[in-house]
Amino acid sequence: MLKILFFAAMSLFITSLNSGSNGNCYYIGNDTEAVLVDAGISCREIERRMKRLGLLMGKIKAVFVSHEHSDHIKGLPVLVKKYQFPVYITPMTMRSGRLNFEESLLKNFIAHEPVSIGGLSITAFPKFHDASDPYSFIVSDNNICIGVFTDIGAPCIHLKKYFQQCHAAFLEANYDEEMLEKGGYPIYLKNRIRGGKGHLSNNQALELFIIHKPDFMSHLLLSNLSKNNNSPELVKELFNAHAENVKIIVASRYEETEVFRISLNKSVKEIPVYHTVAKSSLQLSLAFT
């Protein structure tokens, strides 16, 4: 059944297209434009997953790159070449990732200085991670804020400040401390993961959530779970015990999540998306029940 929805004002729509060491890509948009944060899966998979969700590639106006690790950039060259998307990336990340784009498509950003993409405002801030110049992002529109907080070795003061502003967030919960300790990784890799410039553990993420989540937060998408040192069931149970009115979603390393509608009105609950089809001159969009 085909449905058309004229979006209500004052909403953002978010989904994780993939989240994990095999590739990361996050979509945040309003009813007219959207951005991707990272493109760590192939262009073809981005297209397929967005199509399944009823999201139009034509709404994407830019890609923001958090850092140069391959699970965040490996789909970027083909995606940008095909669609000519502007790429917001720092020079150090460009060099470290050995990336090369048309000069006209290259855009820089500066920490804590908002970038306007249509009605969207994107603010980057530095984070602790073992990359050359890594950043997290806040995407906002009409006072609705979405955070993309993954690949973080430890919560910094900026993360805590921005988390308190979020109506929804993609938050890393990479590993269970006991599973990592008892697992088969070599000691150097264990220390890299938990050493302050690697990844957030479930407990670190939970502490941030409990202490700093604002009353108006409606959705938390737990992201970048380790395949070997975590369990979706474990981390969801852990967070649900403290969620109160926040909807907890575990982002998958194998498929896209639903599209979630984030509103200033916390009582607005979206939800499963009816897949749609774009036909010639008629642009169809998401339909929510």
Segments the model singles out, each with a brief description of its role:
Residues 157-253:
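Cap/insert and terminal regions of metallo-dependent hydrolase folds
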Residues 232-240, 244-289:
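C-terminal regulatory/interaction regions
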Residues 74-83, 96-100, 230-237:
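Metal-dependent catalytic neighborhoods of phosphoester/phosphodiester hydrolases
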